[in-house]
Amino acid sequence: MNAFDRARQSAIAAAREARGTYRNGLVTPTAGVAPGMTQANLIALPRDWAYDFLLYAQRNPKACPILDVSDAGSPTTLLAEGSDLRTDIPMYRIWRDGKLAEEVSDATQAWAEHDDMVAFLIGCSFTFETPLQEAGIEVRHITDGCNVPMYRTNRACRPAGRLHGEMVVSMRPIPADRVAEASAISGRYPSVHGAPVHIGEPGRLGINDLSRPDFGDAVSIKPGEVPVFWACGVTPQAAVMASGVPFAITHSPGYMFITDVPDSTYHV
């Protein structure tokens, strides 16, 4: 086995170890965990709503880039052998009639309420944070050991069937002289949101106060830095709320599903 293969096997082992700790009850944001491995957002819906969401994602690929779709009733994915989507995420959200009913570290009981749940794994921008760091671009929420800040915007997504809502974005402060580089690096990963959707001027997105994110934690913006916004996989949760979806299970923002797929797989 050469050095590349050893590094790849080590990264996969780290991903599997992380999923095991979450299955055993550890609750922590996943930014910076298992560097080099693809992370994913989750939304699981009864089969009756699955086509609506599939169409919603197809019409809004920047915010909802699908990496995998499970068979109805199956809590497994080919992106992580031996995993269980009901237990291997640190924190889940259970939604009822468009409202957040509870957050749990194990979704097995809620999942069992419907025998035809269809799970969608959606690309996450955590995936390209390792390449940003390797280029010497600081990722502030990793430095600070907190969750990434996420914001609802005034940008409407294209509706599909019974689903509608606005785009959610994540924000990372980037030095002004490195914004173009950060955009180019992330742009090489279109399956995990790709390049930013907006740079600077948060008010144009309807964001009035960066210190009060709708999801996640606020981070500092230093002199000479610019807030840079990427489409975010929490967008489906905004659609669940806006559309009054009767039942859904999602990851909690910032608490992702870590796959066995290297981030280089989605590099173009």
Swiss-Prot record:
Keyword hit for Ribosomal protein: no
EC numbers, comma separated: 4.2.1.-
Domain of life (superkingdom): Bacteria
Molecular functions per Gene Ontology: lyase activity
Keywords assigned: Lyase
Pfam families (UniProt xref): D-Glu_cyclase (PF07286)
Coiled coil: none
NCBIfam families: PRK05463.1
Family listed: Belongs to the D-glutamate cyclase family.
The protein, known as: Putative hydro-lyase PSPTO_5379
